Amino acid sequence: MSLYATQDEKKQAAAKAALKHLPKGGILGVGTGSTVNFLIELLPELQLEAAVASSEATAKRLKELGIEVVDMNHVGGLDAYVDGADEIDRHMHMIKGGGAALTREKIVASIAKKFVCIVDDSKWVEQLGRDFPLPVEVIPMARSAVARKLVSLGGDPVYREGVVTDNGNVILDVYNLNILNALELEKTINDIPGVVTNGIFALNAASIAIVATNNGIEERTAV
């Protein structure tokens, strides 16, 4: 029997458990997505100086709670970045980008000393990409050319119709990639002309995962 009646209750529990891993005061990097939205509601407890947001949607939520949002260009670094994931494995490698904010998420994560990932256990996987497609942000004029390159890598790219990123680009969701070496594939796809970035977070892996399971909260690190 689960401690939680719904998946949303799991997400709320993971968000609450993450607070102790986040510094009070200072400037926090904040991700995007349904689990992070639960965390944002709790952030006033940390009495933050400000936050760096990974999307316009997150910035709006933070401002509604009275938390100042600052431009990353005015920040030298962050003590922590907190975000969810579409998938995460035992190496703390992730697939992100279901909400199309992957590029800004990766940028903000890159200047943080610590990446705290908050998920429910449905996001914990043995191998990335088997159940969730890999999002790739692409400059619009390069969409077809990039898609052909992704096919040559063994993927089946699908254009995410009607979605334009905060950066004015489009998303290709790539199915059926065999992601055995996440670090290598992240670099390979990023080297394709026209790709802004892809949703593999291996170079910017999580430092710790706060995982809500049926039996409660588990804190996991890379093995």
Swiss-Prot record:
Active site: E105
Binding site for substrate: T32, G33, S34, T35, D83, G84, A85, D86, K96, G97, G98, G99, K123
GO molecular function, one term: ribose-5-phosphate isomerase activity
Pfam families with a match to the protein in the record: Rib_5-P_isom_A (PF06026)
GO aspect biological process, one term: pentose-phosphate shunt, non-oxidative branch
Membrane-spanning intervals of the chain: none
Catalytic activity: aldehydo-D-ribose 5-phosphate = D-ribulose 5-phosphate
Any single GO CC term annotated in Swiss-Prot or TrEMBL for this entry: cytosol
Family recorded in the similarity comment: Belongs to the ribose 5-phosphate isomerase family.
Subunit structure: Homodimer.
Protein name: Ribose-5-phosphate isomerase A
